[in-house]
């Protein structure tokens, strides 16, 4: 319940997005016996291929899509459930530790890191779009693309409007991280 409340709170601010919203909901959802459903869900993710295609395109066009590629690798590792279980019985991990620092500060640092990583991920995605547009001679409306993702898309996020503003201000923007808003945010 505590983690759900943290994600729900984050979803009221700059992290407001579909993925944060559903994470808050999943974390608080109880099974019919009253226990957290999350503990009963198999921790093995599949994939549809869009992340893989994006990571491969990043390599093809020489564009760093490191966060997108890492999410694909995390899913690959996740899908190796049987191997992970077997390895956990053979490899010794660290002993359980209790946190003795400032919990509020720790949670705030996680929020900031998540926000920065989301910004960098979008920046990398738009760099890839810009590189593909240059290669194929496309004239893309990057602000319009950002707004397109606001409705009903898994990557919808409140700061897609900020991305549109950045490209409206500077249609030739080569990297979101060079925009004043995003530069300040990270």
Kindly label every feature range from the protein language model:
Residues 1-186:
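C-terminal substrate-binding/catalytic lobe of Rossmann-fold NAD(P)-dependent dehydrogenases
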């Amino acid at each position: 319940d505590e983690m759900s409340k943290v994600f729900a709170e984050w979803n009221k601010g700059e992290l407001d997005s579909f993925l944060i919203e559903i994470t808050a909901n999943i974390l608080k959802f109880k099974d019919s016996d009253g226990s957290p459903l999350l503990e009963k869900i198999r921790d093995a993710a599949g994939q549809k291929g869009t992340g893989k295609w994006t990571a491969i395109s990043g390599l093809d066009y020489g564009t760093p899509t490191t966060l997108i590629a890492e999410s694909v690798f995390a899913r690959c590792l996740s899908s190796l459930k049987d191997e992970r279980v077997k390895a956990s019985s053979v490899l010794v991990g660290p002993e359980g530790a209790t946190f003795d620092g400032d919990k509020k500060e720790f949670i705030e640092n996680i929020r900031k890191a998540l926000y920065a990583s989301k910004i960098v991920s979008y920046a990398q995605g738009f760099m890839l779009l810009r590189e593909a547009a240059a290669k194929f001679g496309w004239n893309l409306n990057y602000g319009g693309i950002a707004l397109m993702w606001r409705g009903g898309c898994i990557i919808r996020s409140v700061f897609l409007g900020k991305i549109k503003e950045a490209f409206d201000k500077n249609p030739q923007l080569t990297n979101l991280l060079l925009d004043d808003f995003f530069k300040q945010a990270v």
